[in-house]
Amino acid sequence: MNNRITRRDFLKLAGLLPISVAAPRFLGSLDALGRVQVNTQNVIVIVFDAWSAYHISLYGYQRETTPNIAKLADQAVIYHNHYASGNFTTPGTASILTGALPWSHRAFQPGGKVDEAFVEKNFFSAFKNHYRITYSHNLWANILLRQFRDDLETYIPKGKYFLTEEDADSNRGFFLSSNNIIQDLFGNDEDIALVSWIRAMENEQEGYAYSLFLSPLYEEYKKRYNETRFAEQKALFPRGIPRDDYDNFLLEQAIDGIGGLLVTTPQPFMGYFHFWPPHAPYSTHRDFYRRFYEDGYNPPVKPIDLFGDEGPKTKNRTEYDEYILYVDREFGRFYDHLDENGLLENTWIVLTSDHGELFERGIEGHRTPVLYEPVVRVPLMIFDPGRESRTDVYANTSAVDLLPTLLHVTGQKQIEWAEGVILPPFASDETVQDRSVFVVQAEKNEQIGPLTIATLAIRNGDYKLMYFFGYEELGTGGERIELYNIKDDPEELNNLYDTEKEIGQELLNALKAKLKEMNAPYLSTS
């Protein structure tokens, strides 16, 4: 039996896809489709941005933030000590997509790109026998995805699932989102153009607009526009319609759109889908509004950190938890849609995040030098075809493990550049025993050069060590070292570095040795 898709088959399938999504790439996809084998399993990777495992009830959080996912967990492998490779989108996403750590792929600056050596070393090139499709709400994730576009059959533009005039109430004026202006005018340079637009016109949390006159006018106009033009949607979201830093969206619109698209996508496919929630601003659906207000939950009180500036962030923490409820519901709907359309029978689903979120020690968010658990420990759940029971894995795992694991379980050829391992239960537990897992925060460094200002974390067994160096807050030549037993002290309140010197020194030496190895190519030999 010939299992290869012919040109005739491909054209039939192409006709089923929405032309706005498929047309730009179809003619260049014939060679790739010729490689597709119909008896290979599909892969879907779902990333919800800034989603901390610390805030997930499935992992023991006191607030019930994930009731739907908890039910689905009976059909999944649940990883309890899974770590992002960085603490914001660029390094965290790049490690998922390349299977390498930030000090290797070098995408550790805000909005940065992977080093040229990794442009052809990515999830999509590794799954060359699959139809490859992707979408992201997140601009920085899209910058990376566009680097890998030559290895994609379908790249869905960022603006596809943001609100436009077609979603608005009738006859109330006209407005184009930043995404759609850029997509229409600068399709081939969308990422660069959108960053330029933002800097010129938008005054947001990541910086200041270049135009001090136009920016306030634009922001005020957009605010008033959204209050009237999207009145129907606004009624569903008491804290405002969900948005990234620049434009509005509905998560259910992206979930429904991608879910519908996958039903008609050529199989086997490999899809990477990166959604904005529960990243700030925390604009949950009215069904979950004030669900946790005055519920009596009081998080542990922790000291203000050297890099912190305020006290407890209880209000925003509560709103973040309520936003997770929205994520939980929408993933449940997405899973049910795949089930109803028969895709669960031959599809691996990975549910994870690029980094976490922090509401303690005077710090809110994730762009911070600290690497405490809430900002680096993220969910990982793998739903494999036909699974009917739950498996819990407590070994330390990393974002860089996803690529080799998914290649293994789908019978694809392994790649030489991946820095992760094949995860249990799909391989022997020996692959993760006694291994060290690393997290890298190095955004203040040049992409091509040694790391001289950074925070590095290493997790081995029950212990986690954080090593801070180069920050001006530490003084000239200063460094800061913290050691925690995560099993005994999950809140990281008791620094053991001065009392468990042997373990601390062993982990610090391992971390410094790895840093020396990764810095070596960038140090002058003269």
What are these regions (language model features)?
Residues 2-526:
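Catalytic domains that recognize anionic headgroups
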